[in-house]
Amino acid sequence: MGLKEEFEEHAEKVKTLPAAPSNDDMLILYGLYKQATVGPVNTSRPGMFNMREKYKWDAWKAVEGKSKEEAMGDYITKVKQLFEAAGSS
């Protein structure tokens, strides 16, 4: 299985976690997912009244230096860690 296929598998698998990840973990996953699928941030930062979108944008911006492949690998690792923490794999 190639990296892209494994990434896509884990992007689906994360939806089956027994408990919802923390907000911090969700933001990490969001940033890595966007970096892996879109690449570097290509939008302007949302305004101060849209906090949710601003946090998501910041999470994406935080991983901007990673290649798509690095982001995919980190995403897979994070999903595996979340399943281990939840006690199921």
UniProtKB/Swiss-Prot annotation:
GO terms for biological process: fatty acid metabolic process. Keywords: Lipid-binding, Transport. Residues 3-88 form the ACB domain. GO terms for molecular function: fatty-acyl-CoA binding. CDD domains: ACBP. It comes from the Eukaryota. An acyl-CoA binds at Y30, G31, L32, Y33, K34, K56, Y75. InterPro entries: Acyl-CoA-binding_prot_CS (IPR022408), Acyl-CoA-binding_protein (IPR000582), Acyl-CoA-binding_sf (IPR035984), FERM/acyl-CoA-bd_prot_sf (IPR014352). Binds medium- and long-chain acyl-CoA esters with very high affinity and may function as an intracellular carrier of acyl-CoA esters. PANTHER family: ACYL-COA-BINDING PROTEIN (PTHR23310:SF134), ACYL-COA-BINDING PROTEIN, ACBP (PTHR23310). Belongs to the ACBP family. This is Acyl-CoA-binding protein. It comes from Gossypium hirsutum (Upland cotton).
